[in-house]
């Protein structure tokens, strides 16, 4: 082979390699995104159909808020990784006695492992001293310890991480992100949890909603900043520039963790979403933009942690008509008839979900009401 042909061959090889790397990054990014499977609706499909929908749409991770037995049975052999919740209503019982935790783990984890791929046990959801769940705060850490000990007794501590899902009400200062810190009046609650999570090498699960921050302060927060569509840096924080609110919020949590002695802890975004109706700025277009951009964005990391994929769970799989207030009914990626509301992709970016059937159904419904 002469020199010119060798040069062309090397160029072609480099192009192919670059394409493979881009594809690999895209796949890894999509696979780091899961979807929360809530069940507070009276018109939702059965769990077996929901699991098939996850598989057909290439959604590889699921958050379950409680150990629904039909869902766990349907997940057998699915290869879907599961974040399984210990409901807030179970915290007092599990905190009271290690045997209660052992029974819970036996019934809901060991009976299904390894046919069901549990990734995390989320003990409690949004328990906080400054919200309506304040009465549960004293049970949370003992429940986490008992569940962790039960997981260890089952020999699964290297396979299944134990943590809790917290929300942004615990953050006192989030601007600029580098100055993120926990509220002084929650430190006695959160600091021991941070210490426990650090010792067992688990992530902290955090529910992050740019929607609520934007809707609560649209004067100072722009819609493009909340939707990942700002063309330029909006917040300059020292050497770090922020073009979207999601990054600013997640990096504020990292800064708060660092200040509380948890600098080595990873965060997993256990919920993030945007409603399509029911409140200010809750539109189908805004929700579609948010979800699409979030899926693409998390593979890039944040300014504080560039090129480090942010494991994220979209809220939620379906619109749930038994939730309140009104906007809580409209976070679904899918309508209860299993039709996607938005053209999203959990694989290659050119393979978007077909929403024509949903649009046709909506049009037919409107015509019938005329």
Swiss-Prot record:
Record carries keyword Signal? yes
Alphabetical GO biological process terms:
carbohydrate metabolic process
Judged by the first EC level, this protein's enzyme class is hydrolase
Q: What are the alphabetically sorted keywords of the record?
A: Glycosidase, Hydrolase, Signal
E.C. number: 3.2.1.73
- Pathway where it operates: Glycan metabolism; beta-D-glucan degradation
- Source organism's superkingdom? Eukaryota
Looking up InterPro entries in the UniProt record yields: Glyco_hydro_17, Glyco_hydro_17_plant, Glycoside_hydrolase_SF
Cited Pfam families: Glyco_hydro_17
Q: Which reaction does it catalyse?
A: Hydrolysis of (1->4)-beta-D-glucosidic linkages in beta-D-glucans containing (1->3)- and (1->4)-bonds
> For this UniProt entry, which residues form the secretion signal?
1-30
Query: Which molecular function terms from Gene Ontology are attached?
Result: licheninase activity
Active site per database record:
126, 271
The answer to whether UniProt assigns keyword Phosphoprotein to this entry is no
The coiled-coil regions, if any, are none
Give the protein family: Belongs to the glycosyl hydrolase 17 family.
**Miscellaneous field:** The expression of beta-glucanase is influenced by auxins and cytokinins.
Q: What is this protein called?
A: Lichenase
Supply the source organism for this entry: Nicotiana plumbaginifolia (Leadwort-leaved tobacco)
Q: Which gene encodes it?
A: GN1
């Amino acid at each position: 082979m002469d020199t010119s042909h060798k040069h062309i061959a090397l160029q072609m090889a480099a192009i192919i390699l670059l394409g493979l790397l881009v594809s690999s990054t895209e796949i890894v990014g999509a696979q780091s995104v899961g979807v929360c499977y809530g069940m507070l609706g009276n018109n939702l499909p059965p769990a077996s159909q929901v699991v098939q929908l996850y598989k057909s749409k290439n959604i590889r991770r699921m958050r379950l808020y409680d150990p629904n037995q039909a869902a766990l049975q349907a997940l057998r052999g699915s290869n879907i990784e599961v974040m399984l919740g210990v409901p807030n209503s179970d915290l007092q019982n599990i905190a009271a006695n290690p045997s209660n935790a052992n029974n819970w783990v036996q019934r809901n984890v060991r009976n299904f492992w390894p046919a069901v791929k549990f990734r995390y046990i989320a003990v409690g959801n949004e328990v906080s001293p400054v919200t309506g769940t304040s009465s549960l705060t004293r049970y949370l850490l003992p429940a986490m310890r008992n569940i962790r000990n039960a997981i260890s007794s089952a020999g699964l501590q290297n396979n299944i991480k134990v943590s809790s899902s917290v929300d942004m009400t615990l953050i006192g200062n989030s601007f600029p992100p580098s100055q993120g810190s926990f509220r002084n009046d929650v430190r006695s609650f959160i600091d021991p949890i941070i210490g426990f999570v650090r010792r067992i090498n688990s992530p902290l699960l955090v529910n992050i909603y740019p929607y609520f921050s934007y809707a609560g302060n649209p004067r100072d927060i722009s819609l493009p900043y909340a939707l990942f569509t700002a063309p330029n840096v909006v917040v300059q924080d020292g050497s770090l520039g922020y073009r979207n609110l999601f990054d600013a919020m997640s990096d504020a949590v990292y800064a708060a963790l660092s200040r509380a002695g948890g600098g080595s802890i990873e965060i997993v975004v256990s919920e993030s979403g945007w409603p399509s109706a029911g409140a200010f700025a809750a539109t189908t277009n805004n929700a579609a933009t948010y979800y699409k951009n979030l899926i693409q964005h998390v593979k890039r990391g944040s300014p504080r942690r560039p090129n480090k994929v942010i494991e994220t769970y979209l809220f939620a799989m379906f619109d749930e008509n038994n939730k309140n207030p009104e906007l809580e009914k409209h976070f679904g990626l899918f309508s209860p008839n299993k039709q996607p509301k938005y053209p999203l992709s959990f694989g290659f970016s050119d393979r978007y979900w077909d929403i024509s059937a949903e649009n046709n159904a909506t049009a037919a419904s409107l015509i019938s009401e005329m």
